[in-house]
Regions:
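Structured recognition/catalytic domains enriched at protein termini
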Residues: 1-112, 118-217
Protein backbone atom coordinates (compact mmCIF):
# COMPACT_ATOMS: atom_id res chain seq x y z
CA UNK A 1 0.00 0.00 0.00
CA UNK A 2 1.64 3.23 -1.13
CA UNK A 3 0.90 6.85 -0.14
CA UNK A 4 -1.17 9.30 -2.17
CA UNK A 5 -1.09 12.60 -0.25
CA UNK A 6 0.46 14.53 2.60
CA UNK A 7 0.28 17.96 4.21
CA UNK A 8 3.58 19.78 4.40
CA UNK A 9 4.69 20.43 7.97
CA UNK A 10 7.29 23.14 7.36
CA UNK A 11 10.43 23.40 9.45
CA UNK A 12 8.96 22.96 12.91
CA UNK A 13 7.93 19.84 14.77
CA UNK A 14 4.45 20.97 15.81
CA UNK A 15 1.09 20.25 14.18
CA UNK A 16 2.45 17.87 11.59
CA UNK A 17 0.42 15.42 9.50
CA UNK A 18 1.61 12.01 8.42
CA UNK A 19 1.80 10.81 4.83
CA UNK A 20 -1.54 9.25 3.93
CA UNK A 21 -2.27 6.41 3.70
CA UNK A 22 0.67 5.23 5.79
CA UNK A 23 2.91 2.96 3.69
CA UNK A 24 2.55 -0.75 4.45
CA UNK A 25 4.87 -3.20 2.69
CA UNK A 26 4.51 -6.97 2.63
CA UNK A 27 7.46 -9.33 2.35
CA UNK A 28 6.85 -12.17 -0.08
CA UNK A 29 9.15 -15.18 -0.43
CA UNK A 30 9.30 -16.45 -4.01
CA UNK A 31 10.15 -20.12 -3.53
CA UNK A 32 7.56 -22.40 -5.19
CA UNK A 33 9.18 -25.61 -3.91
CA UNK A 34 9.50 -24.47 -0.31
CA UNK A 35 7.05 -26.06 2.19
CA UNK A 36 4.51 -23.72 3.75
CA UNK A 37 5.95 -24.35 7.21
CA UNK A 38 9.39 -23.24 6.06
CA UNK A 39 7.99 -20.10 4.45
CA UNK A 40 6.15 -19.31 7.68
CA UNK A 41 9.40 -19.76 9.61
CA UNK A 42 11.31 -17.45 7.28
CA UNK A 43 8.62 -14.78 7.60
CA UNK A 44 9.31 -14.72 11.34
CA UNK A 45 13.03 -14.07 11.15
CA UNK A 46 13.78 -11.00 13.32
CA UNK A 47 16.67 -9.81 11.13
CA UNK A 48 14.59 -8.06 8.45
CA UNK A 49 14.73 -4.25 8.37
CA UNK A 50 13.22 -1.82 5.84
CA UNK A 51 14.51 1.75 5.45
CA UNK A 52 12.55 4.58 3.79
CA UNK A 53 13.87 7.64 1.93
CA UNK A 54 12.27 10.31 -0.26
CA UNK A 55 13.00 10.75 -3.97
CA UNK A 56 12.00 13.00 -6.85
CA UNK A 57 8.87 12.39 -8.91
CA UNK A 58 11.02 10.74 -11.59
CA UNK A 59 12.61 8.45 -9.00
CA UNK A 60 16.10 9.44 -10.16
CA UNK A 61 17.18 11.93 -7.47
CA UNK A 62 17.16 11.53 -3.71
CA UNK A 63 15.42 14.48 -2.04
CA UNK A 64 16.29 13.90 1.62
CA UNK A 65 18.46 17.02 1.83
CA UNK A 66 17.08 20.51 2.38
CA UNK A 67 18.04 23.99 1.07
CA UNK A 68 21.20 25.66 2.39
CA UNK A 69 19.40 27.50 5.20
CA UNK A 70 18.10 24.23 6.63
CA UNK A 71 20.98 21.82 6.08
CA UNK A 72 20.61 20.34 9.58
CA UNK A 73 17.09 19.18 8.80
CA UNK A 74 15.83 16.44 6.51
CA UNK A 75 12.79 16.54 4.25
CA UNK A 76 11.24 13.50 5.90
CA UNK A 77 10.32 13.44 9.59
CA UNK A 78 9.40 10.47 11.74
CA UNK A 79 10.48 6.85 11.98
CA UNK A 80 12.21 5.92 8.72
CA UNK A 81 13.09 2.35 9.71
CA UNK A 82 10.53 -0.43 10.22
CA UNK A 83 10.86 -3.86 11.79
CA UNK A 84 8.65 -6.79 10.74
CA UNK A 85 5.15 -7.48 12.03
CA UNK A 86 3.79 -10.94 11.30
CA UNK A 87 0.01 -11.14 11.22
CA UNK A 88 -3.08 -11.74 9.10
CA UNK A 89 -4.18 -9.37 6.36
CA UNK A 90 -7.81 -8.30 5.88
CA UNK A 91 -8.50 -11.58 4.07
CA UNK A 92 -7.11 -13.76 6.84
CA UNK A 93 -3.87 -14.63 5.02
CA UNK A 94 -0.63 -14.63 6.99
CA UNK A 95 2.06 -12.16 6.01
CA UNK A 96 5.11 -10.25 7.16
CA UNK A 97 4.44 -6.50 7.08
CA UNK A 98 6.52 -3.35 7.48
CA UNK A 99 4.52 -0.27 8.50
CA UNK A 100 5.51 3.40 8.38
CA UNK A 101 2.72 5.22 10.27
CA UNK A 102 4.80 8.20 11.44
CA UNK A 103 6.34 9.75 8.31
CA UNK A 104 5.81 13.43 7.44
CA UNK A 105 7.14 15.60 4.61
CA UNK A 106 8.29 19.17 5.27
CA UNK A 107 7.85 20.74 1.83
CA UNK A 108 5.11 20.80 -0.86
CA UNK A 109 5.77 18.93 -4.08
CA UNK A 110 5.44 15.61 -5.85
CA UNK A 111 7.66 12.81 -4.60
CA UNK A 112 8.17 9.07 -4.35
CA UNK A 113 9.27 6.98 -1.41
CA UNK A 114 12.03 4.42 -1.78
CA UNK A 115 12.09 1.36 0.47
CA UNK A 116 15.15 -0.83 0.94
CA UNK A 117 15.00 -4.28 2.55
CA UNK A 118 18.09 -5.33 4.48
CA UNK A 119 18.70 -8.63 6.26
CA UNK A 120 20.98 -8.01 9.22
CA UNK A 121 23.81 -10.44 9.80
CA UNK A 122 23.61 -11.72 13.37
CA UNK A 123 25.51 -11.30 15.55
CA UNK A 124 26.26 -7.75 14.46
CA UNK A 125 29.96 -7.04 14.06
CA UNK A 126 31.75 -3.66 14.08
CA UNK A 127 31.99 -2.14 10.59
CA UNK A 128 30.00 -5.02 9.10
CA UNK A 129 27.95 -4.19 6.01
CA UNK A 130 24.50 -5.67 5.50
CA UNK A 131 23.40 -6.70 2.03
CA UNK A 132 20.44 -4.99 0.37
CA UNK A 133 18.03 -7.75 -0.62
CA UNK A 134 15.28 -5.75 -2.35
CA UNK A 135 14.28 -2.20 -3.32
CA UNK A 136 10.87 -0.73 -4.06
CA UNK A 137 9.86 2.69 -5.38
CA UNK A 138 6.38 3.91 -4.47
CA UNK A 139 3.87 5.58 -6.73
CA UNK A 140 4.02 9.37 -6.90
CA UNK A 141 2.32 11.19 -4.03
CA UNK A 142 1.68 14.91 -3.57
CA UNK A 143 2.48 17.02 -0.54
CA UNK A 144 0.10 19.98 -0.24
CA UNK A 145 0.37 23.27 1.60
CA UNK A 146 -1.89 23.56 4.65
CA UNK A 147 -4.55 25.61 2.84
CA UNK A 148 -4.71 23.27 -0.16
CA UNK A 149 -4.62 19.96 1.69
CA UNK A 150 -7.79 17.97 0.82
CA UNK A 151 -7.89 16.05 4.10
CA UNK A 152 -7.02 12.61 5.41
CA UNK A 153 -8.42 9.39 3.99
CA UNK A 154 -10.18 6.70 5.99
CA UNK A 155 -7.88 3.91 7.14
CA UNK A 156 -7.71 0.92 4.82
CA UNK A 157 -9.05 -2.53 5.77
CA UNK A 158 -5.46 -3.79 5.92
CA UNK A 159 -4.42 -1.11 8.43
CA UNK A 160 -7.48 -1.87 10.57
CA UNK A 161 -6.78 -5.60 10.47
CA UNK A 162 -3.15 -5.14 11.54
CA UNK A 163 -4.10 -2.74 14.34
CA UNK A 164 -6.65 -5.28 15.59
CA UNK A 165 -3.78 -7.74 16.03
CA UNK A 166 -1.58 -5.31 17.96
CA UNK A 167 0.38 -3.51 15.24
CA UNK A 168 1.29 0.03 16.29
CA UNK A 169 -0.55 1.82 13.50
CA UNK A 170 -3.30 4.41 14.12
CA UNK A 171 -6.65 4.11 12.36
CA UNK A 172 -8.95 6.99 11.47
CA UNK A 173 -12.32 7.73 9.92
CA UNK A 174 -10.84 10.39 7.66
CA UNK A 175 -11.96 13.89 6.69
CA UNK A 176 -11.45 13.85 2.91
CA UNK A 177 -13.09 16.87 1.26
CA UNK A 178 -13.46 15.13 -2.07
CA UNK A 179 -10.16 16.32 -3.48
CA UNK A 180 -10.97 20.02 -3.18
CA UNK A 181 -8.64 22.56 -1.60
CA UNK A 182 -9.17 25.26 0.97
CA UNK A 183 -10.57 25.20 4.46
CA UNK A 184 -9.02 23.96 7.66
CA UNK A 185 -7.79 20.48 8.34
CA UNK A 186 -8.86 18.43 11.31
CA UNK A 187 -7.43 19.40 14.70
CA UNK A 188 -6.12 15.91 15.43
CA UNK A 189 -2.34 15.73 15.55
CA UNK A 190 -2.10 13.38 12.57
CA UNK A 191 -5.22 14.52 10.75
CA UNK A 192 -8.60 12.79 10.52
CA UNK A 193 -10.69 11.66 13.47
CA UNK A 194 -9.75 8.50 15.28
CA UNK A 195 -11.75 5.43 14.33
CA UNK A 196 -13.85 4.49 17.35
CA UNK A 197 -15.35 1.36 15.80
CA UNK A 198 -15.59 -1.71 17.96
CA UNK A 199 -12.63 -4.03 17.54
CA UNK A 200 -15.10 -6.76 16.58
CA UNK A 201 -16.70 -4.65 13.84
CA UNK A 202 -15.21 -5.01 10.36
CA UNK A 203 -11.60 -5.02 11.50
CA UNK A 204 -10.94 -8.61 12.53
CA UNK A 205 -9.19 -10.42 9.65
CA UNK A 206 -11.00 -13.64 10.52
CA UNK A 207 -14.45 -12.07 10.33
CA UNK A 208 -14.26 -11.68 6.54
CA UNK A 209 -14.97 -14.10 3.76
CA UNK A 210 -11.66 -14.94 2.13
CA UNK A 211 -11.49 -14.06 -1.58
CA UNK A 212 -8.86 -15.19 -4.01
CA UNK A 213 -5.36 -15.14 -2.58
CA UNK A 214 -4.14 -11.93 -4.19
CA UNK A 215 -1.79 -9.31 -2.78
CA UNK A 216 -1.82 -5.57 -3.32
CA UNK A 217 0.99 -3.63 -1.68
Amino acid sequence: MTPSRARSCGFGDRDRRVIDPPPILQLQIDAPGLPREEISRKLRLPSYVVHCSIWSESGEEEMSGMPDDYTRQKRLMGSLVASPFVGLDEHGDEGCFFCFPDISCRTPGRYRLKFVLVVLDWPLRPNARSIIRAELLSDVFQTFSAKDFPGMLESTPLAKALKFQGCNIPTKKGNDRGGGGGGKTDDAGVGGSEDKSSDDEAVSPRSRKRPRNTKNL
